[in-house]
Amino acid sequence: MARYTGPRGRRDRRAGVMLSSMRKNPLEKKPYPPGEHGRDRQRQTEYGLRLMEKQKARWYYGVSERQFRRAYEEAIRQPGVSGENLLRLMELRMDNVVYRMGFATSRPQARQLVVHGHFLLNGRKHNIPSATLKPGDVITVRDKSRRLQPIQEAVEQVVAVPAWLEADHENFTGRVLHTPSRDEIDAPVEEQLIIEFYSR
């Protein structure tokens, strides 16, 4: 499935929540879905609600349907609550961890930086953004990449790093401390509805 490259604000309006890392919230000006009939939003069916929750999670993490479905199948095989397992798998993706550590200003940018080989994983060059990391894994910005404008800007703008990660921005390195719990994940989705969508 092709990756979405259209207006992020339009998609945020469709979801009804801020999913992208845009500085301006498109919902403040137009708090209704895009399109001719956006203001006349009809009541959603239960199927529609579950579908939208799945789409919101996909859009939030910037993954294709195929990748998300594969993560769901892995999540239901793991012990514990399937919905929480799914969100953990999304959070532990290499591109998301790079973004969460503050080495990129958005997930799409983090994905591009990873693909172009600007990071080391445990001391080795790594360019697979979908790779699932684990506690103890160390991410380092390659020496020759540390002066790149996107990375410099991201490091200057970083506000806070989640408690399940640590990041040393002076030395351009970070580590996964532990697997995130649900209350350490700020994804604006109801994960149980996603599980219900796929298991229908």
Swiss-Prot record:
SMART domains: Ribosomal_S4 (SM01390), S4 (SM00363)
Region (Disordered): 1-43
Bias-annotated ranges (Basic and acidic residues): 25-43
Key words of the record: Ribonucleoprotein, Ribosomal protein, RNA-binding, rRNA-binding
Stored InterPro entries: Ribosomal_uS4, Ribosomal_uS4_bac-type, Ribosomal_uS4_N, S4_RNA-bd, S4_RNA-bd_sf
Residues of the S4 RNA-binding domain: 92-158
Listed SUPFAM superfamilies: Alpha-L RNA-binding motif
Gene Ontology cellular-component terms listed: small ribosomal subunit
PROSITE patterns: S4
Pfam families cross-referenced by the UniProt entry: Ribosomal_S4 (PF00163), S4 (PF01479)
GO molecular function, one term: structural constituent of ribosome
GO biological-process terms attached to the record: ribosomal small subunit biogenesis; translation
Family: Belongs to the universal ribosomal protein uS4 family.
Role summary: One of the primary rRNA binding proteins, it binds directly to 16S rRNA where it nucleates assembly of the body of the 30S subunit. With S5 and S12 plays an important role in translational accuracy.
Complex and partners: Part of the 30S ribosomal subunit. Contacts protein S5. The interaction surface between S4 and S5 is involved in control of translational fidelity.
Designated name of the protein: Small ribosomal subunit protein uS4
Source species: Rubrobacter xylanophilus (strain DSM 9941 / JCM 11954 / NBRC 16129 / PRD-1)
Upper lineage: Bacteria, Bacillati, Actinomycetota, Rubrobacteria, Rubrobacterales
